[in-house]
Each structure stands twice: as structure tokens, then as C-alpha cells.
Regions:
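A short, Lys/Arg-rich alpha-helix, primarily the initiator
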Residues: 1-17
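Residues in the recognition helix of alpha-helical DNA-binding motifs
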Residues: 14, 28, 39, 68
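Alpha-helical residues within the helix-turn-helix
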Residues: 16, 27, 56
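Short alpha-helical DNA-recognition segment
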Residues: 19-38
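K/E-rich alpha-helical interaction surfaces of small helical-bundle regulatory domains
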Residues: 35-37, 41, 60-61
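DNA major-groove recognition helix of helix-turn-helix/homeodomain DNA-binding modules
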Residues: 49-64
């Protein structure tokens, strides 16, 4: 459970650090804003393919998304 919370915080922090809105990220990766919200809140899991794309958009390594 602790890891789930860490992922939630890391995704939101990475997005904010990249100066992107939830809608902008959703548009870039062709998912709904609701999906981004759920990922950031830890309500749904992010698949590997989406994590890879998010790490590229946020300009951070995939391991940083998990490690904070």
C-alpha cells in the first residue's frame, strides 16, 4: 500500500514539475483526463507502456516515477 501512495505522489509531482495540466497529459497520450486523475490518485494502475510514455513526457527516468 505504501508503494501505491508513492506512485500517486510521484506522478502528480512529475506532471506539475513539467508544467502540464492533467488535460494536456491526457491529450498527449490519448487517454481521458479521468484516467490521469485515477492514476494520480492511485485508483487504477498505470501500465508499462503508459509509464514509459509518461517518463518521456515528464523528462524523467521510469525508475524515478517509482522511487519519487
Amino acid at each position: 500500500m505504501k508503494r501505491k501512495g508513492l506512485l500517486k505522489i510521484s506522478l502528480k509531482a512529475a506532471r506539475i514539475n513539467a508544467n502540464l495540466t492533467q488535460q494536456e497529459v491526457a491529450d498527449k497520450i490519448k487517454v481521458s483526463k479521468h484516467t490521469i486523475i485515477n492514476w494520480e490518485k492511485g485508483k487504477t494502475r498505470v501500465g508499462y507502456a503508459h509509464l514509459k510514455v509518461l517518463s518521456e513526457i515528464y523528462d524523467i527516468g521510469m525508475e524515478q516515477i517509482f522511487l519519487g
